[in-house]
């Protein structure tokens, strides 16, 4: 199955993607992760991307789509893929569609995890992270010892972009950028809205009911 995953900051997209990766044995492809991997490994596209990133500029669409195309050509993508973080604009969606058809892996469904703004603010304001990669929530998933990571014992910290004023700006920006894509995929009959409020297991079950149609 070939899937694109949308969801605002704090919607639990990463959590669901991790579980879907395990359940369906299709790789979770985060464009940010694969871009950083290409830069780290010094690939041709990675060097090209680094040139823009070092200058604080956005990586051009043609470089991003090249990185995605190369990742989809890897053997673990044969059963399908779960693409996260791309597209972000309708021109990117058009370019992605062309590439996916060209390589014989056309998009089958776009999942949009939908959560109300106030719920997202509550979720994100309580989020604390560790340098080891672990993430906690002071209300929903607190560490055993206050402000200390269960996994490695290091102090937890709150990212600047998890503070309320910044969160609201991020949500406004997300809606402004993503709404045209929601309409774009809705018109193509590919969009499925998922209620992202409530228990993680229930949300996962709802997603699986949708994706099982594409197995």
Curated annotation (Swiss-Prot):
Region (LID): 126-162
Main location: cytoplasm
GO BP, sorted A to Z: AMP salvage
Residue numbers binding ATP: 10-15, 127, 135-136, 198
Reactions this protein catalyses: AMP + ATP = 2 ADP
Transmembrane segments: none
GO annotations of cellular component type: cytoplasm
Binding positions (Zn(2+)): 130, 132, 149, 152
Region NMP, residue ranges: 30-59
Compartment(s): Cytoplasm
Pathway: Purine metabolism; AMP biosynthesis via salvage pathway; AMP from ADP: step 1/1
Role summary: Catalyzes the reversible transfer of the terminal phosphate group between ATP and AMP. Plays an important role in cellular energy homeostasis and in adenine nucleotide metabolism.
Domain remark text: Consists of three domains, a large central CORE domain and two small peripheral domains, NMPbind and LID, which undergo movements during catalysis. The LID domain closes over the site of phosphoryl transfer upon ATP binding. Assembling and dissambling the active center during each catalytic cycle provides an effective means to prevent ATP hydrolysis. Some bacteria have evolved a zinc-coordinating structure that stabilizes the LID domain.
Family stated for the protein in its record: Belongs to the adenylate kinase family.
Full protein name: Adenylate kinase
Species in which this protein is naturally found: Methanococcoides burtonii (strain DSM 6242 / NBRC 107633 / OCM 468 / ACE-M)
């Amino acid at each position: 199955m070939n899937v694109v995953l949308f969801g605002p900051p704090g919607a639990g997209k990463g959590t669901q993607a991790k579980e879907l990766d395990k359940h369906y044995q299709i790789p979770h492809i985060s464009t940010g992760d694969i871009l950083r991997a290409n830069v780290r490994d010094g690939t041709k596209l990675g060097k090209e991307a680094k040139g823009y990133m070092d200058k604080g500029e956005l990586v051009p669409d043609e470089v991003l789509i090249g990185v995605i195309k190369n990742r989809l050509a890897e053997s673990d993508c044969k059963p399908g893929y779960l693409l996260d973080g791309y597209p972000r604009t309708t021109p990117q969606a058009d370019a992605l569609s062309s590439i996916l058809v060209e390589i014989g892996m056309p998009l089958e469904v776009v999942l949009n995890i939908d959560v109300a703004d106030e719920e997202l603010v509550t979720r994100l304001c309580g989020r604390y992270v560790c340098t080891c990669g672990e993430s906690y929530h002071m209300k929903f998933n607190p560490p055993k010892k206050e402000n200390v990571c269960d996994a490695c014992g290091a102090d937890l910290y709150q990212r600047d972009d998890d503070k309320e004023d910044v969160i609201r700006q991020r949500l406004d920006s997300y809606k402004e950028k993503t709404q045209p894509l929601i309409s774009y995929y809705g018109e193509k009959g590919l969009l499925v809205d998922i209620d992202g409020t409530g228990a993680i297991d229930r949300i996962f079950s709802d997603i699986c009911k949708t994706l099982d149609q594409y197995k």
